[in-house]
Amino acid sequence: MSRPEAVICHPVRTAIGTYNGALKTTPAVELGAVAIRECLRRSGLAPEALDSVVMGNVIQAGNKMNPARQAAIHGGVPVDKPALTVNRVCGSGAQAVASAAMEIWLGLAHAVVAGGCENMDLAPYLMPGARWGYRMGDGQIYDAM
């Protein structure tokens, strides 16, 4: 049984920032959107021609739900196209590409944008008891990174 060939074409990456540097206020989903827009521009592929978007993102706290979907929509992908967020520490972007290839091999998709989006500068501090208010005694703050 043969499977469709999965080909990586027109790869794009954003700049690599330094901690507390120029990208410290840029949300991960916007970095992902920039990469998606540029990949589509370079390839000449219309966003409507995509079947799926797969993006890796590890520190999802503060990014709201499904960062891949947010990046896809901000990147110009129509809202009727599905998006999957992959979370595999230190390998989410690579896993996103592998998962996109699997979608193609299984015949679920023909054109998929895959990659990763992360900004560790925006990893929030978490206060588990803050939603309902702290009372007497010490509270605790956790670093999401």
Tell what function each PLM region has.
Residues 49-56, 113:
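Short glycine-rich phosphate-binding loop at a beta-alpha junction
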